[in-house]
């Protein structure tokens, strides 16, 4: 199957670009994920910093894209340049399986579009649109792999909420006895994913960095992210420290983070009718995927998670996470449990449930989410 995909992708590129060389390998890959989600939410009481909310419970049920993993297709290529050096590229496009629409702001390759060089001894350099270091290093520590709707670790740790930047130069070292580091700089984040996203002429910049250790059953990661906006505006920043240990029968995950002066990517809790006052400093917090700054905002974040295999085809996982803000905002607690069942090596069923109390940092906001779905990788 992999050989067929590689040959097919190579034939496509050869037809587009001319001669294909034997030392070049191109792989076509992807996955499709779609499910059904039920949500029941209660919009909380009035908050002086966020505007007026109602107090009724509301619910809905419908088809949802990418509960476990965002649907995508991509091309991954490498060319051997000799002496351990290779040219590499990744072009990855996100889409919604329920309607066929493009994701990531209707970009053609919104998930990733990079070209770079990789050396066996000196590491890898990538240029283009890609995720930050935190989203790379904590995907294996979070029991929910930074996915599954509100169950993602990114709900409480916004710098790990699959943050993507345009115009990024990123260097990652090779693994030295299990240790690896990385640093990236975006010359213009150019975010267009939300209605208040960054415009190109804003020239907002960002830095992302981290180190991790992966050895046997132990994983440890530390990351730091900061965004640089106009000099008169706050500069959001967050560090995250996390670890996971696999006891074979159970994998335990722990993380702590601290955010200052804003949110990198807010989780969309979709409070079904609760409208944030657009004139308040906290606009967009929790209800959209927008980034925002708020001078003096501080949020301490915590995660405790577990995962365990059941037989040879099933896994169960759970987590508790808390985001504890200042500014008189409400603590947010999220309790989650998930389950996967492998039908084959490439196809699986899944189920997930989560309960958020104090969602979007507002007293009385409650959100229950239950989803089931099917994922196929190719």
Mark where each language-model region is.
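Residue-level signature of outer-membrane beta-barrel architecture
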Residues: 77-79, 117-119, 173-174, 213-215, ...
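Outer-membrane beta-barrel "beta-signal"
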Residues: 341-343, 366-378
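Gram-negative bacterial Sec-dependent N-terminal signal peptides
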Residues: 1-22
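Transmembrane beta-barrel strands of outer-membrane/channel proteins
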Residues: 32-36, 91-93, 129, 183-185, ...
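Repeated loop/turn-to-beta-strand initiation elements of outer-membrane beta-barrel proteins
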Residues: 85-87, 121-125, 178-181, 217-222, ...
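Hydrophobic, lipid-facing positions within transmembrane beta-strands of outer-membrane proteins
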Residues: 69-73, 111-115, 165-169, 205-209, ...
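Outer membrane beta-barrel
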Residues: 23-38, 48, 58-188, 212-219
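Detector for outer-membrane/organellar transmembrane beta-barrel domains
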Residues: 202-336
């Amino acid at each position: 199957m992999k050989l067929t995909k590689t040959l097919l992708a190579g034939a496509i590129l050869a037809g587009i670009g001319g001669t294909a060389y034997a030392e070049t390998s191109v792989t076509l890959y992807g996955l499709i994920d779609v499910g059904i989600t039920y949500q029941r939410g209660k919009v909380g009481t009035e908050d002086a910093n966020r505007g007026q909310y109602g107090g009724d419970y509301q619910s809905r049920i419908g088809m949802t894209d990418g509960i476990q993993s965002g649907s995508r297709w991509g091309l991954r290529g490498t060319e051997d340049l000799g002496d351990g050096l290779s040219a590499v590229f990744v072009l990855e496009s996100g889409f919604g399986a329920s309607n066929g629409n493009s994701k990531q702001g209707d970009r053609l390759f919104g998930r990733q579009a990079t070209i770079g060089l990789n050396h066996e001894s000196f590491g890898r350099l990538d240029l283009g649109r890609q995720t930050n270091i935190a989203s790379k290093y904590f995907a294996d520590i979070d029991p929910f792999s930074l996915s599954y709707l509100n169950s993602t670790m990114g709900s409480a740790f916004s710098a790990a909420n699959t943050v993507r930047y345009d115009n990024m130069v990123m260097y990652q070292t090779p693994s030295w006895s299990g240790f690896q580091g990385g640093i990236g700089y975006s010359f213009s984040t150019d975010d267009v994913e939300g209605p208040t996203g960054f415009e190109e002429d804003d020239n907002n910049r960002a830095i992302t960095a981290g180190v991790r250790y992966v050895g046997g059953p132990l994983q440890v990661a530390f990351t730091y992210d900061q965004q640089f906006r106009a000099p008169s505006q706050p500069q959001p920043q967050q560090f995250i420290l996390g670890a996971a240990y696999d006891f074979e029968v159970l994998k335990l995950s722990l993380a702590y983070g601290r955010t200052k002066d804003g949110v990198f990517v807010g989780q969309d809790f979709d409070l079904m009718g609760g409208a944030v006052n657009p004139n308040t400093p906290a606009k967009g917090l929790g209800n959209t995927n927008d980034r925002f700054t708020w001078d003096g905002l501080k949020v301490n974040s915590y995660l405790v998670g577990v995962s365990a295999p059941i037989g040879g085809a099933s896994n169960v996982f759970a987590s508790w996470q808390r985001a504890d803000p200042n500014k008189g905002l409400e603590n947010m607690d999220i309790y989650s449990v998930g389950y996967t069942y492998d039908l084959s090596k490439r196809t699986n069923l899944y189920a997930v449930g989560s309960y958020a109390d104090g969602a979007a940092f507002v007293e009385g906001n409650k959100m229950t989410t239950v989803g089931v779905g099917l994922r196929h990788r190719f």
